[in-house]
Amino acid sequence: MSVACVLKRKAVLWQDSFSPHLKHHPQEPANPNMPVVLTSGTGSQAQPQPAANQALAAGTHSSPVPGSIGVAGRSQDDAMVDYFFQRQHGEQLGGGGSGGGGYNNSKHRWPTGDNIHAEHQVRSMDELNHDFQALALEGRAMGEQLLPGKKFWETDESSKDGPKGIFLGDQWRDSAWGTSDHSVSQPIMVQRRPGQSFHVNSEVNSVLSPRSESGGLGVSMVEYVLSSSPGDSCLRKGGFGPRDADSDENDKGEKKNKGTFDGDKLGDLKEEGDVMDKTNGLPVQNGIDADVKDFSRTPGNCQNSANEVDLLGPNQNGSEGLAQLTSTNGAKPVEDFSNMESQSVPLDPMEHVGMEPLQFDYSGTQVPVDSAAATVGLFDYNSQQQLFQRPNALAVQQLTAAQQQQYALAAAHQPHIGLAPAAFVPNPYIISAAPPGTDPYTAGLAAAATLGPAVVPHQYYGVTPWGVYPASLFQQQAAAAAAATNSANQQTTPQAQQGQQQVLRGGASQRPLTPNQNQQGQQTDPLVAAAAVNSALAFGQGLAAGMPGYPVLAPAAYYDQTGALVVNAGARNGLGAPVRLVAPAPVIISSSAAQAAVAAAAASANGAAGGLAGTTNGPFRPLGTQQPQPQPQQQPNNNLASSSFYGNNSLNSNSQSSSLFSQGSAQPANTSLGFGSSSSLGATLGSALGGFGTAVANSNTGSGSRRDSLTGSSDLYKRTSSSLTPIGHSFYNGLSFSSSPGPVGMPLPSQGPGHSQTPPPSLSSHGSSSSLNLGGLTNGGGRYISAAPGAEAKYRSASSASSLFSPSSTLFSSSRLRYGMSDVMPSGRSRLLEDFRNNRYPNLQLREIAGHIMEFSQDQHGSRFIQLKLERATPAERQLVFNEILQAAYQLMVDVFGNYVIQKFFEFGSLEQKLALAERIRGHVLSLALQMYGCRVIQKALEFIPSDQQNEMVRELDGHVLKCVKDQNGNHVVQKCIECVQPQSLQFIIDAFKGQVFALSTHPYGCRVIQRILEHCLPDQTLPILEELHQHTEQLVQDQYGNYVIQHVLEHGRPEDKSKIVAEIRGNVLVLSQHKFASNVVEKCVTHASRTERAVLIDEVCTMNDGPHSALYTMMKDQYANYVVQKMIDVAEPGQRKIVMHKIRPHIATLRKYTYGKHILAKLEKYYMKNGVDLGPICGPPNGII
């Protein structure tokens, strides 16, 4: 029987059926607070347990009695319930209740199966503590992204009864029961995109309708799924176990592949007779017709069942920690689930985005992590300290958290990532320091044996947006990290109390508070205070390993539904514990910590920490070769066989493929958390994380490629910076999400090679590709916006302003432009510099670029900005800049733009600053002098530093003078030394020139130095130089460089030196005047010689004959000598000039034929017009004959 009930725009559809194999319990009256009551013909009702609720709310440890959970008794009838729910914008959930820390019965907006009745809806301890990480964010505007959920059902013959899952994803499409029973129309303008779903074997669409508005719908949906999922009794039948592939013969007669769950039959997912293609002609969304329903329909999400959050091991009693879920049949030993681990648990295949198919395999164990204290059996499933009660539930937990957080964080830069951000906290993160040793895995490993479930799930360590945090944080947080050391040392001894001091924040998640929250003024919260004690214990364990402090993202605040910032950790469900930051550069670790890490690895008797020796204490976290563990039964002493974060195998044999980017299509093993076994992570953690390494993956499966397909051997950065960088500059970039095709350029097995891999144009280059949103697309004000396919254009402008460090950010104040140094744009520049270059901050001040001085100094426009500001800056501003550049002064000195900043300090800086920079130059004078840009700094320094420092600087060149003189850069330094330094200090240069004057004078650079010596050195220093010059005057005047030295002597030399040179020229005026270089010397001789010497030279030209013509005629036609004649006309005495004129007049007509003769005629006309002298007609007869 099918009934449709519509209450307040909420359409609820259910169907009662009979499941004879389940126990019957009396029905209880419905809770009037529930909007819709769904009753089943059968069903096991949980007994009321208010005490458990209140115990949890008080933060105490309690253990509900068997039967209070209603796990095994979960009615199969609820499997056939499909909900179509639509909440209006701004509509809030039901009022608060008294139990479960705010979780009351009226909170569930949909019928929740058997436990919808008030008496039976006792939220179990694990549900309250771990309702899917951040599900308490429903008060926020979660955006138009659904978070579909589903649950695992038993694998028995009852699967033929009909659909068994509760699928919330396809809210706007075809009814799961057919249009005849209940039809919900598809909203207008919702684009259908086949092949976008994340299912391996089904052609399902994943359309997120804009009508899904921003009321937190997805959160409550998943919350419902979590609250009504079956317990361990169902899972004991093997949620991942084998099934009969023919059991779905009623499912349209269409047999699906087993998918990647290898025989995991989760129940028929379509009702018999249901037509796959409805009015919209598309398959029912969210895989209603697929067997494998344990993954999300939206990118980046996956379903998890409620029992995945069981806190303690099956054999652990409630007194050792928080209350655990106990099935009605008793705890099931771990061995019952060993068969589950033999299959891989891949995530839903993503759409093609230009890489080879990278499978998202997670198995049912914790993900390997890197830690120096890896000797503790953290994930020993044979011990009492299990983190989760059931391995298969743990697998689902990993699928959920790892896919949503680690993958989403890794992928988020691309606008074509279809990630559902609803489960994440977007901006409300306060960056602070966790004290030394509080790395969740360092401290957790050390304290695991006594803290029980204190171990932080792996999503804590998710590779948080790679490099989106200022590198300076590592230094800035050192003080805070050290400050917490004393208190932690005092708390390391009471080990017996650790089991009772495990406190979870407000029942939000399984992850304990970390000490960084103690530094944020939150001790007023009793839960926080208790967590402080617990975290201090773990902190003390980390101290033993010598681990330094780690910067973490502390979700110390969140935005409520009104957009107000609420800073109160623990008061809100779902605000996850701090996320450890991964440095944009190699991880900074002290030498003592490095030694301690090596020692810890060496001290491991069973080799548990063997994989840490090469990974923890160095800047690299290399990828090892994957070695799958074939045996299904783990060994207690080998749980941490490879604890590397990018380790070369899983923590134990239960986890054969716990990889974020596993190799191959559906390979169950040979993967690690980091990336595929054949993928290179790059040289260092910081430099390569952005691009997923130099090679993303060498997958074994082929995929369609495109012009920029990111194959295993391709360059990740082939696209120009003007286009949206493929993954690459998620390289330090922030995270932002959109549901455009596929995550991080990964091709999906379910999509053909022809699937579009082009990112949407709306978020290219500078859009949301640079924003940091741990929770998805926000509009810059903490509000979610739609991440549905096609919604990018709607929020194009909003997403572009959602950068963590942008002025419109909700995390940092816009009064100080707090950009992270690692928030690198596709151009490679920081966001601040990029905005400055684009004139977005025309009134930027020096103080506003604090922390970016080095970057600005090395940029063309940034360097110019600093130079201009330094000229008019106050001493305090200059000191601000100086403090940042001093340590890296040498780097700037040799930089093409940075050297100008250093020069400005020599020019405008204080004496102390000049001396400090001069001290940085000491010892590097020669290298800087020979460097293109460093030589400029040396020259500027020589101009402005005191003489004592000048002398010290110059002395470093002693012995290298000739090398510098002949160098294109060094010669400028030597010239500046000669110009600025006292000549007495330069005698070593004069001595070095002895015997080398001719060679240096004919050298392109040496000739300049010779001239500087002649200008500035003392007479007794220049005499030996001049003597050598006079010996080679004839050769020098004809040399392309030597002629400049002779001209310099004629211009600036003593009269006796000039006379010596003129004497060398006399008798050779005609010949030398026709020489390209010597003609310049003759000109200088005519100009600078004495009157007598000048008359002699002019007379020589007038009286000498060159064959049939006079020498003057020859010179007037010559391309070089004509300039000598012109100079003679200019400088000759009046009487001698008249003689020259008369000598030229007979050749006037002929000179008109020659290019250079015309210069002479022009000179004559100018002269005669000026003086009014009439020499007759200048123009001769037409035939040219006189």
UniProtKB/Swiss-Prot annotation:
Region spans: Disordered: 22-73, 233-272, 485-524, 613-648, 742-775
Omega-N-methylarginine PTM sites in chain numbering = R796
Task: Quote the subcellular location field of this record.
Answer: Cytoplasm; Cytoplasm, P-body; Cytoplasmic granule
**Superkingdom, natural source:** Eukaryota
Q: Region labeled Adenine-nucleotide binding in RNA target — which residues?
A: 863-867, 935-939, 1007-1011
Listed under subunit, the entry gives: Recruits the CCR4-POP2-NOT deadenylase leading to translational inhibition and mRNA degradation. Interacts with TRIM71 (via NHL repeats) in an RNA-dependent manner.
Q: What does this protein do?
A: Sequence-specific RNA-binding protein that acts as a post-transcriptional repressor by binding the 3'-UTR of mRNA targets. Binds to an RNA consensus sequence, the Pumilio Response Element (PRE), 5'-UGUANAUA-3', that is related to the Nanos Response Element (NRE). Mediates post-transcriptional repression of transcripts via different mechanisms: acts via direct recruitment of the CCR4-POP2-NOT deadenylase leading to translational inhibition and mRNA degradation. Also mediates deadenylation-independent repression by promoting accessibility of miRNAs.
Task: Check the record and name the PANTHER family matching this protein.
Answer: PUMILIO HOMOLOG 1 (PTHR12537:SF1), RNA BINDING PROTEIN PUMILIO-RELATED (PTHR12537)
Q: What is this protein called?
A: Pumilio homolog 1
Q: Which lineage ranks, top first, belong to the organism behind this chain?
A: Eukaryota, Metazoa, Chordata, Craniata, Vertebrata
